[in-house]
């Protein structure tokens, strides 16, 4: 029977499946951070259990840490408690931890691939909803809750029901100036934020194949934003080239054997998908969200929709509520909308490719006077090191931006990087929910180049009309 890539990955990891019961999957890699792991370790201690496979678990600090200081003693409140707990728990169990004293520390979904911890064919879990990022390597990766974190620590397995299979094909080549972020926002705009519910999505087509691994990670990162359980891209030479020589990637004959296996990880030609979505790459414009979920998105050359013209009552009510919160009128041209802050970072867009794209826009230009703050936050210490080696930090600083240390930063209001009330932000992150970046903050999701352009022009502009340096 022909199988999709998802079905192959799932079936290869079933440990036990009784008739009428949820299958139990083996988990190859478990990534943890300071926010969703403390209660799980507490649960292990209460039950008198050990971490079953320490060598398959890796930790980092990212969500609640400061991007301004690297000293845990200078953290405050809950953030300090969480970081100290993670450090204590990893030391007590022998789990490898990339803490703030190491250059390998970073956002969990940046650090994992960088270290070669993310490999094709794996099952990967983390107590974080954007674990789908790792699916860019042809791994079955998804977020789990804290009770499931405890279960994986104790058993290295997880009960998991089978999902439906969805294929999203992006045909042809994108036009100049169009990025992975624009592709995935356009996909979400077409499917809506619930279009992938109950599915694992495989992204394919020429436009996806043309993406770097950084770009593929951006696309898979946001699979959750249209309701999917996980996102996948079948591994190919781009994948292998990225992974070769990474610290935890196979070496020597093991590498050759691994690549031979990885080349089998693709959907069979006659595999049947439950849902198929097709986009033409040439039709994708630079994307900007106008509302309070990633599916409320338009091309920069379009006007904000008018709820009065929407026929579905639920969609109409959602749009009316979103526009009231975001402070926009129907039929507004977003190119006339000024921004207060700009955030370039997050597990969606904080890799070296993203920073290069932003720097190309900001080089030789200055932050607009109406923009209060521009935060540029690399996704890991290694990304920061590479950016500084290339002089990107100097470009950002000369433009009036702040160059920070690695962390989740302003993606979420969980640390000291936040929007002020009713401030409007051009953000490269993945969620524009109400209050996501701070109480009553207004978030517009864009690509790194679009965010950088908003920083120097003080408003949203069409990046296709901006000269790059």
From Swiss-Prot:
GO biological process: L-leucine biosynthetic process
Residues that coordinate or bind [4Fe-4S] cluster: 347, 408, 411
Enzyme Commission number, as recorded: 4.2.1.33
Catalytic activity: (2R,3S)-3-isopropylmalate = (2S)-2-isopropylmalate
Domain of life: Bacteria
One family name in Pfam for this protein: Aconitase
Pathway terms, separated by semicolons: Amino-acid biosynthesis; L-leucine biosynthesis; L-leucine from 3-methyl-2-oxobutanoate: step 2/4
Keyword terms, alphabetized: 4Fe-4S, Amino-acid biosynthesis, Branched-chain amino acid biosynthesis, Iron, Iron-sulfur, Leucine biosynthesis, Lyase, Metal-binding
Annotated GO MF terms: 3-isopropylmalate dehydratase activity; 4 iron, 4 sulfur cluster binding; metal ion binding
InterPro entries recorded: 3-IsopropMal_deHydase_lsu, Acnase/IPM_dHydase_lsu_aba_1/3, Acoase/IPM_deHydtase_lsu_aba, Aconitase_4Fe-4S_BS, Aconitase_4Fe-4S_dom, IPM_dehydratase_rel_enz, IPMI_cat
Cofactor dependency: [4Fe-4S] cluster
Alphabetical list of CDD domains matching this protein: IPMI (cd01583)
Enzyme class: lyase
Cofactor stoichiometry and binding remark: Binds 1 [4Fe-4S] cluster per subunit.
Subunit structure: Heterodimer of LeuC and LeuD.
Annotated family: Belongs to the aconitase/IPM isomerase family. LeuC type 1 subfamily.
Protein purpose: Catalyzes the isomerization between 2-isopropylmalate and 3-isopropylmalate, via the formation of 2-isopropylmaleate.
Protein name: 3-isopropylmalate dehydratase large subunit 2
Biological source species: Mannheimia succiniciproducens (strain KCTC 0769BP / MBEL55E)
């Amino acid at each position: 029977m022909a199988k999709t890539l998802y079905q192959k990955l799932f079936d290869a990891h079933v440990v036990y499946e009784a008739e009428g019961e949820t299958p139990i999957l083996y988990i190859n890699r478990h990534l943890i951070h300071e926010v969703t792991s403390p209660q799980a370790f507490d649960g292990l201690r209460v039950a008198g259990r050990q971490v079953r496979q320490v060598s398959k678990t890796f930790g980092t600090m990212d969500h609640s840490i400061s991007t301004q200081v690297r000293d845990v003693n200078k953290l405050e409140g809950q953030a300090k408690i969480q970081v100290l707990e993670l450090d204590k728990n990893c030391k007590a169990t022998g789990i490898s931890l990339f803490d703030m004293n190491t250059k390998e520390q970073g956002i969990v979904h940046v650090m994992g691939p960088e270290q070669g911890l993310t490999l094709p064919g794996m099952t990967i879990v983390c107590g974080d909803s954007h674990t789908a990022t790792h699916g860019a390597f042809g791994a079955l990766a998804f977020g789990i809750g804290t009770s499931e974190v405890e279960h994986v620590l104790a058993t290295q397995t997880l009960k998991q029901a089978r999902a439906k299979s969805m294929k999203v094909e992006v045909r042809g080549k994108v036009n100049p100036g169009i990025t992975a972020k624009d592709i995935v926002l356009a996909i979400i705009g077409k499917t809506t934020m619930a279009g992938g519910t109950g599915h694992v999505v495989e992204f394919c087509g020429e436009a996806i194949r043309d993406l770097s691994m950084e770009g593929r990670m951006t696309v898979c990162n946001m699979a959750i934003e249209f309701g999917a359980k996980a996102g996948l891209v079948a591994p190919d030479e781009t994948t292998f080239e990225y992974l070769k020589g990474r610290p935890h990637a196979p070496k020597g004959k093991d590498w050759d054997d691994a690549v031979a296996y990885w080349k089998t990880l693709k959907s069979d030609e006659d595999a049947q998908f439950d849902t198929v979505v097709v986009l033409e790459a040439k039709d994708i414009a630079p994307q900007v969200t106008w509302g309070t979920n990633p599916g409320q998105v338009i091309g920069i050359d379009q006007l904000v929709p008018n709820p009065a013209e929407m026929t579905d009552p639920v969609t109409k009510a959602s749009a009316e509520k979103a526009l009231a919160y975001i402070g926009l009128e129907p039929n507004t041209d977003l190119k006339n909308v000024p921004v207060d802050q700009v955030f370039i970072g997050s597990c969606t867009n904080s890799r070296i490719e993203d920073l290069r794209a932003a720097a190309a826009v900001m080089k030789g230009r200055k932050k607009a006077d109406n923009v209060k703050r521009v935060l540029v936050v690399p996704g890991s210490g290694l990304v920061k090191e590479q950016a500084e080696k290339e002089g990107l930090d100097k470009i950002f600083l000369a433009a009036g931006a702040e160059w920070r240390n690695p962390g989740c930063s302003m993606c979420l209001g969980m640390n000291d990087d936040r929007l002020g009330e009713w401030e409007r932000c051009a953000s490269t992150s993945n969620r524009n929910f109400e209050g996501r970046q701070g109480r009553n903050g207004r978030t517009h999701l864009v690509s790194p180049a679009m965010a950088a352009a908003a920083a120097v022009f003080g408003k949203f502009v069409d990046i296709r009309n901006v000269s790059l340096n």
